[in-house]
């Protein structure tokens, strides 16, 4: 299942029989060796394809086949014929007529896919053997094929890329029939400045914004920009003809050129599509063999009112609508369908840029395979030609080996049996018991993720992950079961990587739950008691991650070492500290940010770390002002505040904390010292009035936390407020 092919079954001997005669393709015993045939005067790319077949065959049989270049050959010869036919509709076909075996593809790239499919289907060679270059020791060294074969294969998408590190290996991508941008793209992303940095570009190459040239953006009606970029494009292509795709994107901002030429083409201060697509058309007409793409992004979101050339394509990003729910079942479907339909009317090649991990936490299992499968079926139905599945790039993410494999299979054929593929992969890569344990766990989570109606964005904290699909009881039980196998596989990278991720997830769940059964601590008579298990888990995370050579856990490369240090510092401070304000009611008197209204963060027992997505309440529209009842915290001697400073995101410590009565009279005032560290979490303690002081707390009192003043919109990040 999963392979798309047409089998022509020729009747042999009886019209009711589909049994075929076998002919020997290779036999060491009888000295039967096929020759690899490619056309006379083949280019280097065809020669590389022949070498791929030769290499695979040598790994399998320890026999090195001869490669010959000649266009004509005797049909009675035992030859493996490799050909490219750009006019055929199938990606590749495998054919046999008596002794001649032919693999013919629509492109050299597809020829590599066809060669590897030959070994998958007709021999015992698998990818593990190929990657280790060790064949099957039990092979009889005889390969027999049916005397007549005619099988043709066509993928559901012409461009298929799961963007995970395993797919960056060319052997892997060719074996699994995927694309890899380094092997296909001459220019990728927002890299025009990098490509042109060697030139001293004239002013006319830059955008005119508000009547002045601005070097932060390009002018896409500029003849100078076209001249310099054309020069670099042809240099790149001539250095490697496989690099025939070029992404032409404006710089990553919202500036649009409004010079006279661009305005005449249709540009406005917010829409650069007319000039960008005119520029693309000009490139496409000049280089008809190349393919040029842009992206529906920032100032290029409006469909131009003219048709793009046939060798122009567009990437459409799902970043704003990828919420862990199949798009067709979401509130975004109608808009999405309309957008794709509109773009398809003007651009022949529409590709989807999709997302398959939680970029805030690469250890989140994020089991979106079933959702992705539904989305791929939708993309196919809407006429999308290519899909780029953005994964964890060069970084490890949980079970990325499984996800890369399944996504590769799914991009080729959207109708694969998902459970069968998951089970098959795990059985091939883990012991029988561990494979069963992993399969049951992961398939259950995949179903839970798919069936949940709750949205989970690709930038989410553990709280949202747990609410969507990750039941703590299930995770903790699985953790104990899997960890037993890790102890006996301490030098196996796959086990260590999964153990690192699961330990991190368990700690995150415990941190988020705060106190109680699933939390990191318990509360006894208002005193925090940190569980002894936490120290063990932190030691394991440190050990597993070092052995697995994993040092970060998200897109912004947050350090695991700092994560562990942050945990240890926090539990050292928290253990046996009083907490009189835990989950007590309070009133918020200030305005809250639209996306940050969960004020339970302030006294739920959970604590934040250096990542602002971990239990921090962010306030940018106003200071934070709370009203608290004195009776609820009557035994407290002081208030301990936790704040975050992350200057990259304009998050700063507050300037002043005030305690006021309900008449707005100041009872206590504390000015915080200025901290120069750009990224820091810190506690500040404010002593409450003693019975001997003149100013006393009123029955209801106000806590006013005043954010840093200055130019621009600064943000305040507050975590636990502990009365102790």
Segments predicted by a language model, with ranges:
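Extracellular carbohydrate recognition and processing domains
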Residues: 666-692
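Short, surface-exposed beta-strand/strand-loop-strand elements in extracellular ectodomains
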Residues: 650-664
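Structured mid-domain segments that build the active-site/substrate or prosthetic-cofactor binding neighborhood
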Residues: 224-225, 334-433, 440
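Feature activates predominantly on carbohydrate-active enzymes
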Residues: 29, 33, 49-52, 56, ...
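Disordered, acidic Ser/Thr/Pro-rich linker "stalks" and the adjacent N-terminal cap
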Residues: 18, 566-636, 640-653, 675-680, ...
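Short beta-strand-plus-loop segments that form exposed binding edges in beta-rich domains
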Residues: 704-712
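Catalytic domains of carbohydrate-active enzymes that cleave complex glycans
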Residues: 411-604
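Acidic, contiguous N-terminal accessory segments
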Residues: 17-98, 125
């Amino acid at each position: 299942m999963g392979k798309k092919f047409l089998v022509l079954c020729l009747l042999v001997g009886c019209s009711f029989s589909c049994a075929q005669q076998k002919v020997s393709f290779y036999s060491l015993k009888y000295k039967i060796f096929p020759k690899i045939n490619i056309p006379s005067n083949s280019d280097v790319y065809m020669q590389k394809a022949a070498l791929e077949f030769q290499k695979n065959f040598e790994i399998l049989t320890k026999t090195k086949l001869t490669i010959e270049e000649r266009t004509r050959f005797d049909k009675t010869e035992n030859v493996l014929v490799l050909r490219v036919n750009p006019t055929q509709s199938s990606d590749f076909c495998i054919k046999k007529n008596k002794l001649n075996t032919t693999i013919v593809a629509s492109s050299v790239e597809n020829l590599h896919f066809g060669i590897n499919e030959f070994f998958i289907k007709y021999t015992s060679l698998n990818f593990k053997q190929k990657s280790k270059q060790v064949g099957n020791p039990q092979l009889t060294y005889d390969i027999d094929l049916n005397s007549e074969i005619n099988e043709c294969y066509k993928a559901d998408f012409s461009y298929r890329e799961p963007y995970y590190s395993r797919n960056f290996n060319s052997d892997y991508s060719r074996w699994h029939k995927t694309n890899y941008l380094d092997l296909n793209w001459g220019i990728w992303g927002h890299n025009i400045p990098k490509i042109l940095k060697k030139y001293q570009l004239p002013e006319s190459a830059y955008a005119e914004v508000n009547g002045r040239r601005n070097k932060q953006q390009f002018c896409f009606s500029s003849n100078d920009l076209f001249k310099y970029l054309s020069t670099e494009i042809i240099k790149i292509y001539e250095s490697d003809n496989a690099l025939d795709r070029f992404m032409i994107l404006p710089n990553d901002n919202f500036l649009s050129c409004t010079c006279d030429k661009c305005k005449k083409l249709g540009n406005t201060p917010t829409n650069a599509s007319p000039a960008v697509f005119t520029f693309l058309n000009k490139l496409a007409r000049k280089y008809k063999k190349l393919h040029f793409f842009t992206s529906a992004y920032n100032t290029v979101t409006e469909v131009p009112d003219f048709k793009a050339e046939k060798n122009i394509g567009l990437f459409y990003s799902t970043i704003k609508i990828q919420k862990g729910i199949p798009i067709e079942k979401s509130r975004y479907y109608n808009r999405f369908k309309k957008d794709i339909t509109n773009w398809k009317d003007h651009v022949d090649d529409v590709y989807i840029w999709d997302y398959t991990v939680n970029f805030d936490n690469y250890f989140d299992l994020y089991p979106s395979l079933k959702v992705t499968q539904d989305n791929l079926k939708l993309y196919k139905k809407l006429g999308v030609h290519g899909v780029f599945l953005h994964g964890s790039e060069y970084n490890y993410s949980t079970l990325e080996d499984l996800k890369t494999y399944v996504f590769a299979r799914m991009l080729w054929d959207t109708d694969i049996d998902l459970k069968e593929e998951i089970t098959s992969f795990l059985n091939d890569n883990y012991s029988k018991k561990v494979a069963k344990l992993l399969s049951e766990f992961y398939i259950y989570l995949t179903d839970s993720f798919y069936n949940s109606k709750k949205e989970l964005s690709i930038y989410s904290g553990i709280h949202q992950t747990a609410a969507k699909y990750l039941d703590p009881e299930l995770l903790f039980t699985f953790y104990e079961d899997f960890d037993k196998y890790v102890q006996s596989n301490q030098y196996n990278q796959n086990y260590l990587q999964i153990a690192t991720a699961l330990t991190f997830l368990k700690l995150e769940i415990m941190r988020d739950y705060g106190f109680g059964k699933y939390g990191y601590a318990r509360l006894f008579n208002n005193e925090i008691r940190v569980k002894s298990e936490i120290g063990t888990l932190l030691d394991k995370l440190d050990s597993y991650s070092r052995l697995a050579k994993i040092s970060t856990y998200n897109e912004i490369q947050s350090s695991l070492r700092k994560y562990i240090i942050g945990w240890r510092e926090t539990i050292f401070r928290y253990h046996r500290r009083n907490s009189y304000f835990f989950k007590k009611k309070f009133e918020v008197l200030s305005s809250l940010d639209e996306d940050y209204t969960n004020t339970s963060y302030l006294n739920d027992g959970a604590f934040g770390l250096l990542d602002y997505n971990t239990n921090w309440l962010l306030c940018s529209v106003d200071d934070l002002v709370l009203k608290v009842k004195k009776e609820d915290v009557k035994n407290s001697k002081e208030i301990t505040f936790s704040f975050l400073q992350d200057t990259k995101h304009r998050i700063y410590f507050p300037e002043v904390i005030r305690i006021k009565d309900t008449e707005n009279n100041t009872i206590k005032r504390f000015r915080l010292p200025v901290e120069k560290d750009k990224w820091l979490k810190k506690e500040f303690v404010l002593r409450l009035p003693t019975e001997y002081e003149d100013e006393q707390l009123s029955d209801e009192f106000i806590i006013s936390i005043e954010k840093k003043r200055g130019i621009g919109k600064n943000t305040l990040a507050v975590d636990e407020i502990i009365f102790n």
